[in-house]
Curated annotation (Swiss-Prot):
GO biological process terms held by the UniProt record: response to amino acid
Molecular function terms, GO-annotated: sequence-specific DNA binding
HTH asnC-type domain span: 4-65
UniProt name for this protein: Bkd operon transcriptional regulator
Listed InterPro entries: ArsR-like_HTH, AsnC-type_HTH_dom, Dimeric_a/b-barrel, Tscrpt_reg_AsnC-like, Tscrpt_reg_AsnC/Lrp_C, WH-like_DNA-bd_sf, WH_DNA-bd_sf
Annotated organism of origin: Pseudomonas aeruginosa (strain ATCC 15692 / DSM 22644 / CIP 104116 / JCM 14847 / LMG 12228 / 1C / PRS 101 / PAO1)
Domain of life: Bacteria
Amino acid sequence: MAELDRIDLKILRALADDGRLSWRDLAQKVGLSLTPTLRRVRRLEEEHYIQGYFARLDEERLSGAMSVFVSVSLEKQTGDYLARFEERIVDAPQVMSCFQMTGDADYMLRVVVKDLAAYQAFLTNTLTCIPGVAGIKSAFALKSVMLRSAPPL
């Protein structure tokens, strides 16, 4: 993998801000002609610095946007328990992100549901049905202050 230089970082920042930039506009933003810009983008894609292009959807308009942060503890932290949980949780469309954690909980989820009834249905029909789940703690977000689409570059 090649080291990222100043131009690569400019490309990544520009695409993180607007993944729909035309190649010509991107080239102009980073100060290169079209061909070298495209070559760099392809390399960044091949080396998995760019993992895809996504539309940021309005969660509130589409699903009601109740965000719930859910700490999940498992009965055991052995490989089979962890694998079983991860295999099942990735299939739940309400789960926007899932992180394995250190500390009191084994996993932290961000769940998006329409309302409290939808969250209760998620708990009873999905989360508590996963074998090995021993404890669940929920915290409801009051508002979203900010959401970044890329790490600091």
